[in-house]
Amino acid sequence: MKTVKVNIVTPDGPVYDADIEMVSVRAESGDLGILPGHIPTVAPLKIGAVRLKKDGQTELAAVSGGFLEVRPDQVTILAQAAETAESIDKERALAAKKRAEDRLNKRSDDTDIRRAELALQRAVNRLDVAGN
């Protein structure tokens, strides 16, 4: 089966690098499925899971926004933060979720609601990808 090279990169360095059969992402415009030979595309990403189909198995990575660049033979995801499912610290993600929920539940004049909502989305995404 044909494959496409996929790189997931953050400011801290590479997170994922492999040849895969298909990648699925959640872009601002909706969900995208990319196969080898896909037309060149650039799209902003939402907080969500990246699904990577490799050897008939699906691997997951959590991304916190960023951009997707597609070329016929390569897909690059430039993310603000990204983690593979096996590298996610579930305890840390649960703690982040609780902190965000507490901030939203105890709203005060100095609470940045949008920031707390995004923190909650990131934590829930990480927990979903980790399989919790």
Swiss-Prot record:
Which InterPro entries does the UniProt entry name for this protein?
ATP_F1_dsu/esu_C_sf, ATP_synth_F1_dsu/esu, ATP_synth_F1_dsu/esu_N, ATP_synth_F1_esu_C, ATPsynth_dsu/esu_N
In terms of PANTHER family, this protein maps to: ATP SYNTHASE DELTA/EPSILON CHAIN (PTHR13822), ATP SYNTHASE EPSILON CHAIN, CHLOROPLASTIC (PTHR13822:SF10)
Work out whether the entry's keyword set contains Glycoprotein. Answer: no
NCBIfam families given for it? ATP_synt_epsi (TIGR01216), PRK00571.1-3 (NF001846), PRK13446.1 (NF009980)
What's its membrane topology? Peripheral membrane protein
Q: Know the name of this protein?
A: ATP synthase epsilon chain
Q: How does it assemble?
A: F-type ATPases have 2 components, CF(1) - the catalytic core - and CF(0) - the membrane proton channel. CF(1) has five subunits: alpha(3), beta(3), gamma(1), delta(1), epsilon(1). CF(0) has three main subunits: a, b and c.
Q: What is its main location?
A: membrane
Per UniProt, subcellular location reads as: Cell membrane
Q: Which UniProt keywords apply?
A: ATP synthesis, Cell membrane, CF(1), Hydrogen ion transport, Ion transport, Membrane, Transport
A GO molecular function annotation here is:
ATP binding
Which is a Pfam family this sequence falls into? ATP-synt_DE
Q: Which HAMAP family match?
A: ATP_synth_epsil_bac (MF_00530)
Could you confirm whether the keyword Cell membrane appears in this record? yes
Task: State the function annotated in the UniProt record.
Answer: Produces ATP from ADP in the presence of a proton gradient across the membrane.
Q: Which family does it belong to?
A: Belongs to the ATPase epsilon chain family.
Which Gene Ontology cellular-component terms appear in the entry?
Answer: plasma membrane; proton-transporting ATP synthase complex
